[in-house]
């Protein structure tokens, strides 16, 4: 009986010590496994979140461009055969400076408009540009082109599908160079092809959209 009591007493003394060992925390292997899982979630999740944000922003960017085009056309209506010969980056910057959808970076001749659909939004990447164009043998400046470069594939073909409603020509450069997906300036005309537009987009921020208006 005394032997049993002594054994129980020893077990009682050792119990806190064993409990103390169990409370030391996670092992290095366990911490490494948790870190690896968190990194994997970040690698998979961040691009998916980015694509979701861009996809939802695309209609707002397209509508902002449509408003700009409508204003520019109304301001230059009746200005001869080449009303857009003087359009440049300043034209776009001044019109977009108060926008809550796109952002203007810099000032003066070095200012640029970031579309927010891919790219850095500076240094000529992920920006919107404008330039005079000609269509169907017309004078240079009879039309103008708006280009969005470094666009993420999540904006395709939504961006083209919305803006094409008011554009005469739409081209997409992505998978296989510059491809015309709509051209109403020639005979016979080429209606917009959404499937062709979707096929041209390549994964990542590597797509360029150009819309020509007159």
Q: What role is predicted for each listed range?
A:
Residues 47, 66, 157:
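Short alpha-helical basic/polar micro-motif
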Residues 2-4, 8, 14-61:
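N-terminal single-pass transmembrane signal-anchor helix
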Residues 12-15, 29, 55, 71, ...:
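Generic signature of intrinsically disordered, low-complexity segments enriched in small/polar residues
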Residues 12, 73, 161-164:
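Residue-level marker of positions within ordered structural domains that often coincide
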Residues 50-100:
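Membrane-proximal N-terminal amphipathic helix
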Residues 81-214:
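Periplasmic/extracellular, small/polar-rich flexible segments of pilin-like filament-forming proteins
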């Amino acid at each position: 009986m005394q032997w049993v009591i002594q054994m129980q007493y020893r077990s009682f003394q050792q119990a806190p010590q064993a409990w103390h060992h169990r409370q030391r925390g996670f092992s290095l292997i366990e911490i490494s496994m948790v870190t690896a899982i968190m990194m994997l979630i970040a690698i998979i999740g961040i691009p998916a979140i980015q694509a979701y944000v861009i996809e939802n922003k695309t209609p707002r960017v397209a509508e902002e461009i449509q408003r700009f085009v409508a204003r520019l056309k109304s301001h230059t209506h009746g200005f001869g055969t080449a009303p857009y010969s003087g359009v440049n980056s300043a034209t776009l910057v001044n019109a977009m400076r108060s926008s809550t959808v796109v952002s203007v970076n810099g000032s003066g001749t070095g200012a640029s408009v970031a579309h927010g659909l891919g790219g850095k939004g500076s240094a000529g990447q992920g920006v919107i540009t404008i330039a005079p164009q000609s269509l169907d043998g017309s004078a240079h400046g009879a039309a103008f082109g708006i280009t969005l470069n470094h666009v993420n594939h999540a904006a395709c073909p939504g961006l083209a599908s919305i803006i094409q409603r008011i554009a005469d020509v739409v081209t997409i450069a992505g998978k296989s160079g510059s491809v015309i997906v709509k051209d109403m300036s020639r005979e016979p005309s080429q209606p917009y092809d959404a499937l062709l537009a979707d096929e041209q987009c390549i994964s990542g921020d590597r797509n360029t959209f150009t819309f020509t208006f007159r």
